[in-house]
């Protein structure tokens, strides 16, 4: 028997049958979480064809993309189109017998936060959902990937998908993570190195002492943003940290079933002599806090660096891309990244809206005020995260510093609700994408860790968070 990677083992264990000699298989899917934005046409297709949902109990419907995050929670959408999506979503849940986490549900939140809170993600699972950041679930030793609307319809009806097997990439991250650096900095470093298409056609497995040292929530950030390199899957072998994190969650097995599950989950790893199609090595020793300066997550650099000079790029297509990015972002080649002035600071999203992210933000903000010209918004990843942040006293720190403390939702990660930037606004953002218009038409986005966002809000411009913290914090 040949040695296998963890990715190959997960795909093999869920393969119903091989479909051809080109790597296509019929894949069984354990779980799916659907949102109000990408699923409506799929349910319409079921109705038109007179089909039912094969296993409603393996699905969760969750409202997160278009809902308001105003401090006083309500379920009225300001956009008529958004209201229509939500109303139809509720109808689909009722008609097809699928559990719905509605806007006012105490379990509501961003799908990739809610799923692990409710114990819906378990090691060894294969999970598909109508959102590209489903790769997040790799932090638990599961294979997660995003699918399109037609695939959602097929999944609802059959519990299966036609799936093309991916190549494998091993990303080894060694060394101790430096002071004030985080998982966000690791993944931005990876993106800078391999590019926005460097993992296209691959499933990534993250390994190494730096990965083992990360918390489970840090690993979620890492796997969440692997898709920004083109990866259609990102996995970290589960360990005791994962098992402790998921223990006692609502949908987790209990008693003897839990012990049996642990025995199985403990075997989930790549074979020692497994061969990967590609290997990337990162040493954390010289890693610094990272920020993006351009219009793609791979257009990034260390906060101590400068905006690049396009004329120094020998590849004409890459040079053109640099020029386009600088024009849209309104930046001058050679300027210090820490001199970039911001108008907004946003903390939240499925990348960095969890409780550990908010604790890191509170360390920076405690006893400080944000700059008078900056509007700061913090949106917890779920209603449960919001409650916990309030119980820990974090919310009081945010409010005292001048941040708006909101209800949960996708919010300003994407311009699909009422939290939208105006043309020319510049935002330090703890999200995952900085494409033109992502946070609003003509708006400019700089990605960074939540702590870096908090530091920028205080300074009024991009700044090295290390200057605001004491080593050891």
UniProtKB/Swiss-Prot annotation:
Heterodimer of LeuC and LeuD. It comes from the Bacteria. The keyword Metal-binding applies. It is an enzyme of class 4 (lyase). This is 3-isopropylmalate dehydratase large subunit 2. It catalyses: (2R,3S)-3-isopropylmalate = (2S)-2-isopropylmalate. Its cofactor is [4Fe-4S] cluster. The gene is leuC2. Keywords: 4Fe-4S, Amino-acid biosynthesis, Branched-chain amino acid biosynthesis, Iron, Iron-sulfur, Leucine biosynthesis, Lyase, Metal-binding. The lineage of its organism: Bacteria, Pseudomonadati, Pseudomonadota, Gammaproteobacteria, Enterobacterales. Coiled coil: none annotated. It comes from Salmonella typhimurium (strain LT2 / SGSC1412 / ATCC 700720).
């Amino acid at each position: 028997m040949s040695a296998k990677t963890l990715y190959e083992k997960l795909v093999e264990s869920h393969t119903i049958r091989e479909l051809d000699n080109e790597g296509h298989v019929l894949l069984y899917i354990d779980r799916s979480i659907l949102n109000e934005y990408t699923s409506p046409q799929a349910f319409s297709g079921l109705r038109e064809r007179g089909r039912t949902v094969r296993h409603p109990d393996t699905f969760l419907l969750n409202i997160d993309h278009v809902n308001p995050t105003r401090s006083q929670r309500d379920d009225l959408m300001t956009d008529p189109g958004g209201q229509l999506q939500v109303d139809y979503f509720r109808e689909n849940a009722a008609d097809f017998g699928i559990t719905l986490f509605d806007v006012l549900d105490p379990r509501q939140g961003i799908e990739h936060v809610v799923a692990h809170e409710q114990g819906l993600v378990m090691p060894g699972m294969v999970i598909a959902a109508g959102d590209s950041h489903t790769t997040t679930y790799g932090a638990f030793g599961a294979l997660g990937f995003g699918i399109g609307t037609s695939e959602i319809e097929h999944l609802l009806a059959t519990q299966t998908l036609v799936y093309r097997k991916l190549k494998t990439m091993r990303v080894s991250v060694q060394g101790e993570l430096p002071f004030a650096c985080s998982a966000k900095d690791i993944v931005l470093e990876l993106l800078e190195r391999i590019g926005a298409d460097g993992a296209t056609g691959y499933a990534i497995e993250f390994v190494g002492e730096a990965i083992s040292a990360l918390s489970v929530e840090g690993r979620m950030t890492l796997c969440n943003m692997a898709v920004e390199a083109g990866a259609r899957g990102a996995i970290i072998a589960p360990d005791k940290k994962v098992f402790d994190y998921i223990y006692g969650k609502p949908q987790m097995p209990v008693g003897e079933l839990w012990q049996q599950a642990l025995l199985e989950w403990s075997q989930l790893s790549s074979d020692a002599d497994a061969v990967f199609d590609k290997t990337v090595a990162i040493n954390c020793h010289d890693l610094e806090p990272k920020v993006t300066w351009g219009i793609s997550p791979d257009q990034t650099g260390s906060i101590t660096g400068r905006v690049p000079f396009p004329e120094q790029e020998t590849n004409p297509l890459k040079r053109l891309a640099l020029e386009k990015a600088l024009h849209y972002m309104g930046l001058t080649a050679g300027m210090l990244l820490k001199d970039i002035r911001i108008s907004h600071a946003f903390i939240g999203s499925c990348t960095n809206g969890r409780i550990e992210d908010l604790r890191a933000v509170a360390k920076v903000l405690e006893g400080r005020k944000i700059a008078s010209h900056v509007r700061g918004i913090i949106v917890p990843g779920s209603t449960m995260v919001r409650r916990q942040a309030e119980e820990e006293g974090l919310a009081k720190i945010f409010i005292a510093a001048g941040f708006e403390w909101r209800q949960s939702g996708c919010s300003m990660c994407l311009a699909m609700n009422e939290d939208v930037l105006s043309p020319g606004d510049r935002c330090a953002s703890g999200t995952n994408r900085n494409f033109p218009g992502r946070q609003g038409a003509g708006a400019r986005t700089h990605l960074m860790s939540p702590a870096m966002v908090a530091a920028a809000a205080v300074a009024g411009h991009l700044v090295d968070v290390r200057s605001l913290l004491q080593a050891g914090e």
